[in-house]
Amino acid sequence: MLSPAKTPAGIRAEPLVSLENVGVLRNGRWLVRGVDFSVSRGEIVTLIGPNGSGKSTSAKAAIGVLKPDEGRVERKAGLKVGYVPQKLSIDWTLPLSVRRLMTLTGPLPERDMLSALESAGIAHMLDAEVQHLSGGEFQRALMARAIARKPDLLVLDEPVQGVDFSGEIVLYDLIKSIRNATGCGILLISHDLHVVMAETDTVICLNGHVCCRGTPESVSRSPEYVRLFGSRAAQTLAVYSHHHDHTHLPDGRVQHADGTVTDHCHPDDGHHAHEHGHAGHEHDHDHPDHAHPHAHEAGERHA
């Protein structure tokens, strides 16, 4: 198993990566602008937002895959990053074992390989062919591959995409156990605007900029939810309440309080009377359901 590496109690962990007023411009259009957040050792930060809101772009800027056009990104010296992409292109007609998957980007000591697979709960599948794995098992294999080289920061792009509800619970429990065992920081990207991993320390809602941020509210307080999905789900998932002055439309555009509609919103676009700086506010609008994943590929980088 992986050995714990936690920050001593009472000492605030130094950020592994921090973004300050980051903007990424492509073809004359800002994909994201004015993005600020940080991830520290042992911390779980979840980025949520509709399709095309800049979640993957912000994560890539954080780990250095994309260079921001404005603002700055600071990373801990010698930062090691483990990355689980949203989509991994594999020719499923070719034989590929879990063992081979683990070493695609370079050799890996057998001990470290087995330790990572054991942490992911699939050590018994070392010689299994990946095309025979279920969606949840394949995600576990990708997580094992990401943690095998003992990263400081683990970036998970839509880790529960394509997995059924019970599989989501299992994978979120796995992410929690990885964080607890290693003390690594975790940057998690989710397309679900309302339900997030309960262990999340900070939720950041993006739609071209940081719309709002806060902490999740545990769904375990809802007897109806427990009756529907069970106590384990209630302990693993949490509801995040948004608190901003605009509505995310189903197509990803933004409807402002004055009724105007734009592709994205930004604090300096003239539509915002003020920005909220803390969680727990009520608001007078709802988010339509955006629970459909986007399909663009993510660039891959491993520790």
Curated annotation (Swiss-Prot):
Q: Domain of life, per the record?
A: Bacteria
| Coiled coil ranges | none
Mind listing the GO molecular function terms for this protein?
ABC-type zinc transporter activity; ATP binding; ATP hydrolysis activity
Instruction: Indicate how the chain sits in the lipid bilayer.
Output: Peripheral membrane protein
Please name one Pfam family that this protein belongs to: ABC_tran
What reaction gets catalysed by this protein?
A: Zn(2+)(out) + ATP(in) + H2O(in) = Zn(2+)(in) + ADP(in) + phosphate(in) + H(+)(in)
Residue positions annotated to bind ATP are: G49, P50, N51, G52, S53, G54, K55, S56
The protein's location, in the record's own words, is: Cell inner membrane
Q: Which InterPro entries match?
A: AAA+_ATPase, ABC_transporter-like_ATP-bd, ABC_transporter-like_CS, Metal_Ion_Import_ABC, P-loop_NTPase
Where's the ABC transporter domain? 17-232
List the keywords (alphabetical): ATP-binding, Cell inner membrane, Cell membrane, Ion transport, Membrane, Nucleotide-binding, Translocase, Transport, Zinc, Zinc transport
Q: Name one GO cellular component term.
A: plasma membrane
Signal peptide positions are none
Q: Name one GO biological process term.
A: response to zinc ion
Q: Where is this region: Disordered?
A: 263-303
State which Enzyme Commission number(s) the record gives. Answer: 7.2.2.20
Q: Does the keyword Membrane apply?
A: yes
Q: Which Gene3D superfamilies match?
A: P-loop containing nucleotide triphosphate hydrolases (3.40.50.300)
The record describes its quaternary structure and partners as: The complex is composed of two ATP-binding proteins (ZnuC), two transmembrane proteins (ZnuB) and a solute-binding protein (ZnuA).
Question: Which purpose does this protein serve, as stated in its record?
Answer: Part of the ABC transporter complex ZnuABC involved in zinc import. Responsible for energy coupling to the transport system.
Family to which this protein belongs:
Belongs to the ABC transporter superfamily. Zinc importer (TC 3.A.1.15.5) family.
What protein name applies here? Zinc import ATP-binding protein ZnuC
Q: What organism is recorded for this protein?
A: Rhizobium johnstonii (strain DSM 114642 / LMG 32736 / 3841)
Report which gene this protein is encoded by.
znuC
